[in-house]
């Protein structure tokens, strides 16, 4: 859910 997850290309848990 952090920017690290976005860097890894994972769905952002903060948005989902």
From Swiss-Prot:
This is Glucan endo-1,3-beta-glucosidase, basic vacuolar isoform. GO terms for cellular component: vacuole. Keywords: Glycosidase, Hydrolase, Plant defense, Vacuole. Implicated in the defense of plants against pathogens. The keyword NADP does not apply. It catalyses: Hydrolysis of (1->3)-beta-D-glucosidic linkages in (1->3)-beta-D-glucans. It is found in: Vacuole. It comes from the Eukaryota. GO terms for molecular function: glucan endo-1,3-beta-D-glucosidase activity. Belongs to the glycosyl hydrolase 17 family. Its EC number is 3.2.1.39. GO terms for biological process: defense response. Its main location: other.
């Amino acid at each position: 859910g952090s920017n690290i997850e976005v860097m890894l290309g994972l769905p952002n848990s903060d948005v989902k």
